[in-house]
Structure formats: structure tokens, C-alpha cells
């Protein structure tokens, strides 16, 4: 990686600074010349991936990964905080404080979901050379009001995005 801003194998393209719920992050985009550090997948052949609501991912060889369902875990707390926030004065300091608490809770939910997705996609990408994934109409599935929250909580689109870049 870059040390003291210099490395022959990497070129810094740009950096992005972002703020999420009182936390600051910096993200670097580098262009690497030498890709020797990348390891090939352990060749276990091909695998088919089936996405679901109860079992987040089921592989054709029998591996099953359960969905963490972070929104379901924190939904009551989120509802209570949002109800409490709706009762505060419009531009008051208590409303701003509650907004930060709600933002932190949303971040925690997203972090749990992303962590589980990264673990599953990393396992698949590092163990299988060829991955076949079903093509789902997630937008159409979200129109079913009975399943929409569960489908959004699992994160099918993010799973597909992570698996494609890994």
C-alpha cells in the first residue's frame, strides 16, 4: 500500500471523505500496477446460489447461510425512537439528539447486514471458481407488501453487487 504517499505499485486516484451518523470515514481509490497479492479461488468447481428470506443463501453443494435479519431485531426500538421523535418540537435540540440516535441505530442495522453479506460472499468467492446466481426481479418482489420488509432486510441487491466485484 501507500507509505508516505509513495509506492511504485499503486497510484492514488482520489479520496472521499464521508460522514455517517457522527462517524467520519475516508475512502481511497487506488490503481494497482502489480496484482501478485491476489490469490486465486480454491477450486471447488461450480456452485449455484439460491437466495431466500429465511436462509439468506443456499448453495447447490448443501451449504446454508442463515439471514441475520437485523431490522427485525431492532424494529421495535426503531419504532419507539421514531414515535418519540415525532412528538418533539420541530427545530428543537432534543429532536436533533434523537435524530443522531436513530441514525446510529440505522447504521448499526446496515453494518450487521453488510458484515453478514461480506462473510458469505467472501466464502463463495474464495472457495468456488464458477458461481451461478439466480436472476431475481427484486423490484417486483418488493411490491408484495407482506414480504417487502423481509426481502429488503436480507439485501439481495447488495449480495449480487458484492459477489460480482469479488
Segments (PLM) and residue ranges:
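Positively charged, helix-rich recognition surfaces that bind polyanionic ligands
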Residues: 4-8, 14-166
Amino acid at each position: 500500500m501507500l507509505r508516505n504517499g509513495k509506492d511504485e505499485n499503486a497510484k492514488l486516484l482520489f479520496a472521499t471523505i464521508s460522514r455517517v451518523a457522527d462517524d467520519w470515514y475516508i475512502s481511497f481509490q487506488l490503481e494497482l500496477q502489480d496484482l501478485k497479492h491476489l490469490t486465486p479461488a480454491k477450486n471447488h468447481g461450480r456452485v449455484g446460489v439460491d437466495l431466500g428470506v429465511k436462509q439468506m443463501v443456499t448453495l447447490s453443494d448443501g451449504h446454508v447461510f442463515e439471514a441475520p435479519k437485523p431490522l427485525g431485531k431492532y424494529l421495535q426500538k426503531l419504532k419507539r425512537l421514531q414515535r418519540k421523535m415525532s412528538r418533539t418540537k420541530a427545530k428543537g435540540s432534543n429532536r436533533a439528539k434523537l435524530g443522531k440516535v436513530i441514525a446510529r441505530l440505522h447504521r448499526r442495522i446496515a453494518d450487521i447486514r453488510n458484515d453478514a453479506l461480506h462473510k458469505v460472499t467472501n466464502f463463495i468467492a474464495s472457495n468456488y471458481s464458477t458461481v451461478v446466481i439466480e436472476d431475481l426481479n427484486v423490484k417486483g418482489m418488493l411490491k408484495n407488501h407482506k414480504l417487502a420488509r423481509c426481502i429488503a432486510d436480507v439485501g439481495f441487491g447488495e449480495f449480487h453487487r458484492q459477489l460480482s466485484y469479488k
